Amino acid sequence: MNTNAADLPQPRERRRIDLLVGQYAESHRHPTNVAVHWVCVPIIVWCTLALMFVVHPWLCYAFVAASLVYYLRLSVPMAVVMAGFTAASVASFFVVPHVGWVALAAFVVTWIAQFVGHKIEGKKPSFLEDLQFLLVGPLFLLVKAFRKAGLPY
């Protein structure tokens, strides 16, 4: 039987999300640094949204909308999870007393921890080369969680 190469299944092209998370993972291999990221990245996302919300709620909403469009272009399941996280975050801003001060303090502490994690890693944070990686950090963690759970993303 003669088989044309075009008839054979082609290797799946790597999706953009896999490329971005793979690049991000290059500077996030040390177990201590990864553990620091598991704790700090969600807090940093919450703090970033809270600080924007304190400046003006619509600044926060615009950033959330733009971020969710970015996530939707990469992966619908990831966008759904991030939408849930951001919705819960924004809801919390209405009940956390002095949310701006709490966010500012937590932001400073978690970024210090992140830089300590990267010092242990021996590599500088990814976002210093490309700001896009500030949005990839949460995906790095979600991809790990989805893979561990055997869920498609």
Question: What would you call each of these model-derived segments?
Answer:
Residues N2-S27, K119-Y153:
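Membrane-proximal soluble regions of multi-pass membrane proteins
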Residues L20-M52, S67-P77, R147:
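Membrane interfacial helix-start motif at the N-side
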Residues E26-V36, H56-C60, S75, V96, ...:
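Membrane-interface helix-boundary signature
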Residues P57-V95:
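Helix-adjacent hinge/juxtasegments
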Residues S67-M78, F107-K123, L141-A145:
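Transmembrane alpha-helical segments that form the membrane-embedded catalytic/substrate-channel core
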Residues M78-A87, V99-F107, I120-D130, A149-P152:
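A cytosolic-side transmembrane-helix exit/cap motif
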Residues T86-H98, Q132-F140:
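Small-residue-rich segments of transmembrane alpha-helices in multi-pass membrane proteins
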